[in-house]
């Protein structure tokens, strides 16, 4: 998966998925998610795959209001809010520990790293 931060007709962002070919078949690149609504997803850039198969995406929009989120995207392509920043900063560097129990994410300012523990199998999409 990779993000096109300001891609799509509405310029709110897209996520593409690369499916490597097997047995000599060609690789396949497809559009996995495209936002048409800034309230649902806006300027996602850093992303990682959660232990559940969902994506965790860090938003990086530049506005005068505090409005960056960590967005989850289900395997079916539904976006949801996981967290919202309460300070004017962006989330970055999202990744999970090797055992999948701890999610690490950075805040650009004030500079800090958060370590968030699961249980990740109980994340609800609402």
Name each model feature, range by range:
Residues 1-126:
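Sequence/structural signature of beta-propeller domains
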């Amino acid at each position: 998966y990779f993000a096109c931060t300001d891609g799509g007709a509405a310029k709110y962002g897209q996520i593409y998925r690369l499916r490597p070919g097997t047995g000599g078949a060609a690789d396949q690149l497809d559009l996995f998610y495209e936002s048409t609504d800034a309230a649902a997803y806006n300027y996602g850039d850093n992303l990682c795959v959660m232990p559940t198969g969902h994506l965790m995406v860090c938003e990086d929009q530049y506005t005068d209001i505090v409005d960056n989120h960590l967005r989850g995207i289900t395997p079916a392509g539904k976006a949801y809010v996981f967290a919202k920043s309460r300070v004017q900063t962006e989330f970055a560097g999202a990744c999970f520990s090797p055992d999948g129990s701890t999610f690490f994410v950075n805040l650009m300012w004030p500079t800090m790293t958060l370590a968030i523990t699961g249980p990740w199998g109980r994340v609800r999409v609402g």
